[in-house]
Regions:
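Hydrophobic alpha-helical membrane-association signature
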Residues: 30-33, 79, 109, 182, ...
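Residue-level signal for tight coil/turn positions that link beta-strands
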Residues: 9-10, 56, 91, 180
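Terminal peptide-recognition signature
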Residues: 15, 19, 34, 52, ...
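Conserved CoA-thioester-binding segment of acyl-CoA-metabolizing enzymes
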Residues: 1-55, 261
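Short, charged, surface-exposed hinge/linker loops at domain edges
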Residues: 205-214
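Glycine- (often His-adjacent) and acidic-residue-rich active-site loop
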Residues: 36-39, 46, 53-89, 102, ...
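Crotonase-fold acyl-CoA enzyme core
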Residues: 4, 88-201, 229, 233, ...
């Protein structure tokens, strides 16, 4: 079974995460495949818009931690980087339809989408701090740019879950709709976009994002360096061990004592 399924019709490329049994959690191979899909769609003259959604009851539960632990990212093996580059270069509209679990990268990837519909069941979370990690996908810039610094800091530094209504209030999603109407609503918008003049769509998106792209690239570069350091930190090792052992993490034992004066 393919972890990502695509179908193109009438100028719309449907991209569907297809690991419903894992809530569409991402593996390294899926990052690579998704990057290839977006790069190819960017060059395809018959693709005008991407419609992105997940199979089953969730959009994406972030990284598959089993795959993450067996294939930890590093400077020489970082499939997420290829997808980041593909997002930055992508010139066509991306319409996302999200429901259920929208966790970690499942949330940060949305900051690169142009229209985002959330089903009422959507539950978002940026839990990087709980894993002793840091923001990624350029979201240390793109999220504050979209919703403001204080709101972004609240989501990142506390790492707590929030619902679809809150996501709409923050400006992270375009609109909340009933789950049963989610895909139909997103499809209708994709059809409207596909009927617009493609050259004008791409030019408009470039203008809307002028200045934004260079800032995101700089953020990605900084994030990558810090992320690789954090993955190998004592705090991250404790967080991941605690997750696998189903216990609360104890970060006190990873803290360096302050020398007495």
């Amino acid at each position: 079974m393919n972890d990502i399924v695509t179908e193109r019709s009438n100028g719309i490329l449907r991209v569907q995460f297809n690991r419903p049994e894992k809530k569409n959690a991402m593996t390294g191979g899926m990052y690579t495949r998704l990057a290839d899909i977006f790069n190819e769609a960017n060059e395809d003259e018959e693709t005008f818009v991407v419609l992105w959604h997940g199979a089953g009851d969730s959009f994406c539960a972030g990284n598959d931690l089993g795959d993450f632990l067996h294939n930890p990212p590093g400077p020489d093996a970082f499939p997420q980087g290829a997808l980041m580059d593909a997002f930055v270069k992508f010139e066509k509209p991306i319409v996302a339809a999200v429901q259920g679990a929208v966790i970690g990268g499942g949330t940060t990837m949305l900051t690169h989408c142009d229209v985002v519909y959330a089903g009422a069941s959507a539950r978002f979370q940026l839990p990087f701090i709980n894993l002793a990690l840091v923001p990624e996908f350029g979201s240390s810039y793109s999220l504050p740019a979209r919703i403001g610094y204080l709101r972004a800091a609240d989501l990142y530094l506390l790492g707590e879950p929030f619902g679809a209504t809150r996501a709409a209030e923050l400006g992270l999603v375009t609109r909340v709709v009933p789950d049963r109407e989610l895909l139909a609503t997103a499809t209708q918008t994709a059809q409207k976009l596909a009927a617009k003049p493609g050259g004008a769509l791409r030019a408009s998106k470039r203008l809307l994002k002028q200045g934004f792209i260079e800032q995101v690239k700089a953020a990605m570069k900084a994030e990558d360096q810090v992320f690789f350091e954090r993955v190998r930190s004592a705090e991250a090792k404790e967080a991941l061990s605690a997750f696998l052992e189903k216990r609360p993490p104890n970060f006190n034992k990873t803290k360096t004592p302050v020398a007495a004066e």
